[in-house]
Amino acid sequence: KLCKSRNQLLSSYPSSIKEIRFYTNLDKGFRHSSSVLYFAALLYWGIGNFFTRAPRLLSPLQINKEESLINTSNSIGGIEYSDAYLYDNDARFVFNFIDSALENNCKAVNYVESLGSKQDKKGDWLTKLRNNRSNDEFEIRSKIIINACGPYVDQQNQLSNQKTEHHHVFSKGIHLVVPRLNKNERVLTFFADDGRMFFAIPMGGRTMIGTTDTHVSTPETE
C-alpha cells in the first residue's frame, strides 16, 4: 500500500515529489551480502509495480568510480535503488496543498482543535471543535472525515472511538547539516558497525547526515 501511495503521489505531484536514487555501500563483515540486498531491492521494486527505475548491483570498482567520496578499501560492493522525496520540503508541500484546497472552496482555520467525532443515525459525522483562542466550542457536520493529524492520528482516533489495525511508532535522532559532499543528486547510505543505517541526503548546497533510530513514546521533544 505504501508503494502504491508513493507511486500515486509521484504521478499527481510531479513538480513537488520526485524520484531519487539511494546509493548503498557495504563493508566487509556486514550481516548480509550485496547480492542478498540486491534481491531485496528487486522485491521492493516489484512491490511498487516496477514504477521507478530498476535497482543496480554495484561492485567496489563502480562505487569508487561513481562516488569517489566513499572509502571502498573495505567494500564488498553495494546496491542502488529508487524511492521518492519532497523536492522542496514538507512545509511547502502542505502549504501548497492547503492553498490549492482554498481555491476549490475549502475552509481552512487555525487555532481550532478537534475534540472528537461521532456518527449519527444517518451516517453523518458530528465533530466537536474548540476555538483555542476564545475557548468557544461548536459542532460541525460532514459526510466524510480524513484523519490527517500526523503523529497525533492515534490520539484523534481514540477521541472518536475509532480502532485501527496499525499504530504509529515514534523515533528520534540527530541530523548534521554540512556543506554539500557529493555532486550527484542521490542519497548516500551507510551502515554503522552495530547495523544502524545512516543517510547523507543532498539538500541544495548542503548535505544532511543523520539517522532516527531511538524509539520514544510520544512525538513531543524535550
Outline where the language-model segments fall.
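Dinucleotide-binding Rossmann-like beta1-alpha1 core, especially the glycine-rich loop
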Residues: 1-67
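Internal alpha-helical scaffold of NAD(P)-dependent oxidoreductase catalytic cores
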Residues: 8-10, 92-96, 163
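Active-site substrate-recognition segment that forms the wall
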Residues: 16-19, 116, 139-143, 147-222
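Helix-loop-beta segment of a Rossmann-like dinucleotide-binding subdomain
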Residues: 64-104, 126, 139-140, 212-221
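A conserved short coil-to-beta-strand element within the FAD-binding core of flavoproteins
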Residues: 110-126
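A structured beta-alpha segment of the ubiquitous adenosine-cofactor-binding alpha/beta core
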Residues: 114, 128-139
